[in-house]
Amino acid sequence: MEPLLSFKGVTKGFDDVTILNKMDLEIESGHFYTLLGPSGCGKTTILKLIAGFEQPDDGDIIYLNKSIGELPANKRKVNTVFQDYALFPHLNVYDNIAFGLKLKKHSKKDIDKKVIDALKLVKLSGYEQRNINEMSGGQKQRVAIARAIVNEPEILLLDESLSALDLKLRTEMQYELRELQKRLGITFIFVTHDQEEALALSDYIFVMKDGKIQQFGTPTDIYDEPVNRFVADFIGESNIVEGKMVEDFVVNIYGQDFECVDAGIPSGKNVEVVIRPEDISLIEADKGLFKATVDSMLFRGVHYEICCIDRKGYEWVIQTTKKAEVGSEVGLYFDPEAIHIMVPGETEEEFDKRIESYEEFDNA
């Protein structure tokens, strides 16, 4: 299948600073994509290039097999929902949503139908005459989305559009955005620095750092199989320790061999071992894989977050529903499936090839 949109060696800079350097990416139709990364990583620049607000310095942007690198923003089948919503405060809900349709000289009958349909989709039926200044943050968010989808775009861009909402409302809007994307069936491209938001919303995630894509994949793939230390740390909490590969499916940590599910790495290769906090159990000290001392405990609502210090001085973070006494000695236990092996310096292509090789081994 041909991608809906692709970047081919796109380079973009501002004030002699390169933001994107020969970037390649592909977007297929009908999925929810997220550009995830810290501030300054280039994710909003990608959005501006797709929208037509900026043009690439080099490379090309392809939409349905046609170059759009020089195509003006108003000629693209793309609409954007901005972080501040960019609504007109002097216009009511109806006129805000109808604004673009009026510019395009649609008939009043057509505009009425499209506005009413859009309001129904965002669950604001009956709000046509409401003043924008009388609306809550969540309602303004919905109006901004309605104004975008009324133009029937092929791609909807959302630039950190939930960041101004409080936690409860942001969570509610995550459900609504996901449901809306499925109902519309169009491509959503969402920008955020919030990893939990990205995991909850996305079909696919681009994890970015310093203008480069570190890893692309489904939320599950990226969470369970991070390609490097940055991704492992950025996507949720991680315990990362140094180890050495013994052979396929065996890794040595602290001079002790552990079964794992990774293969395709040379024997004796120095590696980094990732174990998620929720995959570690606290048990009696003598029954654990190794011992540690409880250093602190915080109650996080759905679980306790417990920090333990092992004999090497490394701090382990454990998420569990069971309490532990600060200062007590405990045993740490995890299953082979909880261990993920990262090879320092391994590219995403090399990582994917390695994963595929031992998945084929498992299926043989």
Swiss-Prot record:
All residue ranges annotated as the ABC transporter domain in the record: 5-235
Entry EC number(s): 7.6.2.11
CDD domains, per database record: ABC_PotA_N
UniProt membrane topology term: Peripheral membrane protein
Source species taxonomy: Bacteria, Bacillati, Bacillota, Bacilli, Bacillales
InterPro entries: AAA+_ATPase (IPR003593), ABC_SmlMolc_Importer (IPR050093), ABC_transporter-like_ATP-bd (IPR003439), ABC_transporter-like_CS (IPR017871), Mo/tungstate-bd_C_term_dom (IPR008995), P-loop_NTPase (IPR027417), PotA_ATP-bd (IPR017879), Transp-assoc_OB_typ2 (IPR013611)
Family label: Belongs to the ABC transporter superfamily. Spermidine/putrescine importer (TC 3.A.1.11.1) family.
Protein name, UniProt field: Spermidine/putrescine import ATP-binding protein PotA
Complexes and interactors: The complex is composed of two ATP-binding proteins (PotA), two transmembrane proteins (PotB and PotC) and a solute-binding protein (PotD).
GO function terms (MF aspect): ABC-type putrescine transporter activity; ATP binding; ATP hydrolysis activity
Catalysis performed (reactions): ATP + H2O + polyamine-[polyamine-binding protein]Side 1 = ADP + phosphate + polyamineSide 2 + [polyamine-binding protein]Side 1
Keyword annotations of the record: ATP-binding, Cell membrane, Membrane, Nucleotide-binding, Translocase, Transport
Membrane listed as a keyword: yes
Protein location: Cell membrane
A Pfam family matched in the record: ABC_tran
Job of this protein: Part of the ABC transporter complex PotABCD involved in spermidine/putrescine import. Responsible for energy coupling to the transport system.
Highest taxon of source: Bacteria
Residues annotated to bind ATP: 37-44
Top EC category: translocase
Gene Ontology CC terms, in alphabetical order: ATP-binding cassette (ABC) transporter complex
Main location: membrane
